Regions:
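Gram-negative outer-membrane beta-barrel transporters
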Residues: 1-51
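Extracellular loop and loop/strand-boundary signature of outer-membrane beta-barrel proteins
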Residues: 7-13, 57-62, 123-128
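Residues embedded in well-ordered secondary-structure elements
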Residues: 15, 27-29, 61-63, 89, ...
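Membrane-embedded beta-strands of outer-membrane beta-barrel proteins
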Residues: 24-26, 72-74, 138-140
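C-terminal beta-signal and adjacent terminal beta-strands/loops
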Residues: 43-53, 76-144
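Active-site/pore-lining binding-face segments in mid-to-C-terminal subdomains
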Residues: 55-58, 62, 70-72, 84
Length: 144
């Protein structure tokens, strides 16, 4: 949604001016192996405007780069309503899932914020702080 305001006769974007944001989540199971599920999540959104700490938005602003991310995951049902052992340790659980996820599959460097550095001439430069790049995650979830 495009949001802007007029400051001192100049139209500037508001701090929440994110013109687009698209997200997709898809999950499915494999027909031959119904206990194995696959999930895919994708996000792309416009960057937010930001201003140096000692300036006003009417003076100058920069826009962060677009945020892009794709996550994939596989989950395997170890114990469930159709696959419950009658005795032993696992018989006390309703469900147990073992999962493997790859966050930020494309290894994209997304900017979270900026660290502002001032030089001797009192000029400020935006140094980006990046979010975590590609990361693998193994999870075990259980319900009683």
């Amino acid at each position: 949604m495009k949001t802007q305001e007029e400051l001192n006769g100049v139209k500037v974007p508001r701090p929440t001016d994110q013109r687009y944001s698209i997200a997709l989540f898809f999950t499915d199971y494999f027909p031959k192996i119904p206990r194995l599920k696959f999930s895919l999540k994708g996000i792309i959104s416009d960057g937010l405007p930001t201003t140096a700490p000692h300036l006003t938005r009417a003076d100058s602003y920069v826009r962060q780069p677009a945020y892009k991310r794709v996550d994939v995951g596989l989950s395997y049902e170890l114990v469930g309503k159709d696959y419950k052992p009658s005795s032993g340790l696992f018989s006390h659980f309703k469900e147990i899932w073992l999962g493997l996820d790859c966050f930020n599959l494309m290894d994209i460097s997304n900017v979270s914020s900026y660290y502002w550095v001032t030089d001797v001439n009192d000029i400020q430069y935006a140094v980006p702080n990046y979010l975590t790049r590609r990361q693998l995650n193994v999870r075990l979830s259980a319900s009683f």
